[in-house]
């Protein structure tokens, strides 16, 4: 005769008064290995260097410290804290409604460009004043020159068409005593990017650019509204201005959008084929790559590459090209980077 079965204890119903904590999406650790912004932000350490950040720190739905990335003031102070803590920038501010870029992604572009130069230098990143970099459209934030000089001691020339942005960037450079390593220049002719900007005898090891990616203000506004919706901040009763996400018109859009800007940059770069070793630009839309490849062939670029980057769930890339042969690249290295 079989023994009676012991009944299984009934499962307890979950306490409806204590909802389960949301599981935070896992972020891929895909920043450049030399990028200083690996892992989560240490907010207590950031607040120690920049006390005004404290009032912007919140607890996100996953129970982690963060900031409200939809708040321009919070993002601006957060960037100030990052630049001070990681790059020694003591004074940094930008005018209201100007682009306030994410620092980790900007640092990635710098580090991958350093790898590009290392590929011409036996795997060693050239450092110091022997490297000159042109930042095309530096913006009011001047972030690329600040990071590039802090990390590699490179010298920079930042170009910009907006006089207000030039004045803001100059204030940052002067207040941090960086006048000798970061120079600024306004492009007076809005129809050109490089033509009319560079002076006779100037040579650059790199150019870099974060081009405007929208083709109209309407398109830029829609892009801003998508970001608001992604952050759960969209208000269907009120039309959100594009500048809520930061950025003047010249920073966000140009006629023809990113594809036209980049193809014009490529066409103009051919005029400076032996004044620059590597030209480069960010490309936000992968769909623009075929047109860019066509423009590179038309301009006569001898070598080009697409470098993919990833910051968490965001994918980005830059295109780099040169008009110099391998032997000319080695001559450039010997003349500029090899210490006599």
From Swiss-Prot:
It catalyses: adenosine(1618) in 23S rRNA + S-adenosyl-L-methionine = N(6)-methyladenosine(1618) in 23S rRNA + S-adenosyl-L-homocysteine + H(+). The keyword Cytoplasm applies. InterPro entries: METTL16/RlmF (IPR010286), rRNA_lsu_MeTfrase_F (IPR016909), SAM-dependent_MTases_sf (IPR029063). It holds the Pfam family Methyltransf_10. The keyword Transferase applies. It comes from the Bacteria. One of its GO terms (biological process) is rRNA base methylation. GO terms for molecular function: 23S rRNA (adenine(1618)-N(6))-methyltransferase activity. Its EC number is 2.1.1.181. Signal peptide: none annotated. It is found in: Cytoplasm. Residues 1-36 are annotated as: Disordered. Transmembrane segments: none annotated. Its main location: cytoplasm. Keywords: Cytoplasm, Methyltransferase, rRNA processing, S-adenosyl-L-methionine, Transferase. One of its GO terms (cellular component) is cytoplasm. HAMAP family: 23SrRNA_methyltr_F. PANTHER family: RNA N6-ADENOSINE-METHYLTRANSFERASE METTL16, SAM-DEPENDENT METHYLTRANSFERASE. Belongs to the methyltransferase superfamily. METTL16/RlmF family. Specifically methylates the adenine in position 1618 of 23S rRNA. This is Ribosomal RNA large subunit methyltransferase F. It comes from Pseudomonas fluorescens (strain Pf0-1). The lineage of its organism: Bacteria, Pseudomonadati, Pseudomonadota, Gammaproteobacteria, Pseudomonadales.
């Amino acid at each position: 005769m079989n023994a009676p079965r012991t009944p299984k204890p009934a499962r307890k119903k979950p306490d409806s008064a204590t909802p389960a904590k949301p599981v935070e999406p896992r972020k891929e650790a895909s920043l450049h290995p030399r990028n200083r912004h690996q892992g989560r932000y240490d907010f207590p350490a950031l607040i120690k260097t920049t006390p005004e950040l404290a009032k912007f720190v919140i607890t996100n739905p996953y129970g982690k410290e963060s900031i409200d990335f939809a708040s321009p003031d919070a993002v601006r102070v957060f960037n100030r804290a990052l630049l001070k803590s990681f790059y020694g920038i003591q004074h940094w501010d930008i005018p209201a409604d100007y682009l306030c870029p994410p620092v980790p992604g900007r640092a990635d572009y710098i580090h991958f460009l350093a790898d590009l130069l290392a590929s011409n230098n036996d795997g060693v990143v050239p450092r110091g004043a022997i490297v000159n970099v042109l930042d095309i459209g530096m913006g009011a934030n001047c972030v690329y020159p600040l990071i590039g000089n802090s990390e590699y001691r490179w010298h920079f020339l930042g170009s910009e068409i907006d006089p207000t942005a030039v004045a803001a960037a100059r204030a940052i450079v002067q207040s941090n005593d960086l006048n000798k390593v970061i120079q600024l220049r306004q492009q007076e002719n809005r129809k050109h990017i490089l033509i009319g900007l560079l002076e006779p005898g100037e040579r650059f090891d790199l150019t870099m650019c974060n081009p405007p990616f929208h083709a109209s203000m309407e398109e830029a506004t829609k892009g801003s509204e998508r970001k608001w919706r992604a952050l759960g901040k969209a208000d269907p009763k009120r039309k959100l201005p594009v500048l809520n996400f930061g950025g003047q018109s010249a920073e966000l859009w140009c006629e023809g959008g990113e594809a036209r800007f980049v193809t014009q940059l490529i066409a103009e770069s051919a005029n400076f084929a032996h004044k620059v070793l590597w030209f480069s630009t960010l490309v936000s839309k992968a769909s623009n790559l075929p047109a860019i490849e066509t423009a590179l062939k038309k301009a006569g670029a001898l070598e080009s590459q697409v470098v993919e980057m990833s910051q968490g769930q965001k994918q980005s890339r830059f295109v780099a090209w040169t008009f110099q042969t391998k032997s000319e690249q080695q001559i450039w290295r010997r003349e500029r980077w090899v210490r006599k």
